[in-house]
């Protein structure tokens, strides 16, 4: 069996000391969305539960205000 080196997951928001995630910070939010527009789960990103809830709310607000797309593409 081959062993793989797995990078340790850590919460970026805890490390940076973020109090609240801002829905207007689109560049940060884009890092937590897949190509299809889905929110990436915390088990993959390593985000703590508190920040994952804030992240989901911020992404939904940004989508509602058209700062982020709901989906990446609409195939015709």
UniProtKB/Swiss-Prot annotation:
Pfam families attached to this UniProt entry: Ribosomal_S18
Keyword terms of this UniProt record: Ribonucleoprotein, Ribosomal protein, RNA-binding, rRNA-binding
InterPro entries, alphabetized: Ribosomal_bS18 (IPR001648), Ribosomal_bS18_CS (IPR018275), Ribosomal_bS18_sf (IPR036870)
One Gene Ontology cellular component: cytosolic small ribosomal subunit
Transmembrane portions of the chain: none
GO MF annotation list: small ribosomal subunit rRNA binding; structural constituent of ribosome
Biological process, per Gene Ontology: translation
Origin: domain of life: Bacteria
Functional summary from the UniProt entry: Binds as a heterodimer with protein bS6 to the central domain of the 16S rRNA, where it helps stabilize the platform of the 30S subunit.
Assembly and oligomerization: Part of the 30S ribosomal subunit. Forms a tight heterodimer with protein bS6.
Record-stated family: Belongs to the bacterial ribosomal protein bS18 family.
Name by which UniProt lists this protein: Small ribosomal subunit protein bS18
Gene: rpsR
């Amino acid at each position: 069996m081959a062993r793989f080196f797995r990078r340790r997951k850590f919460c970026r928001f805890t490390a940076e000391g973020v109090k609240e995630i801002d829905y207007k910070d689109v560049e940060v939010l884009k890092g937590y969305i897949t190509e299809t527009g889905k929110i990436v789960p915390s088990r993959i990103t390593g985000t703590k539960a508190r920040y994952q809830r804030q992240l989901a709310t911020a992404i939904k607000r940004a989508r509602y205000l058209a700062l982020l797309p709901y989906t990446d593409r609409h195939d015709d």
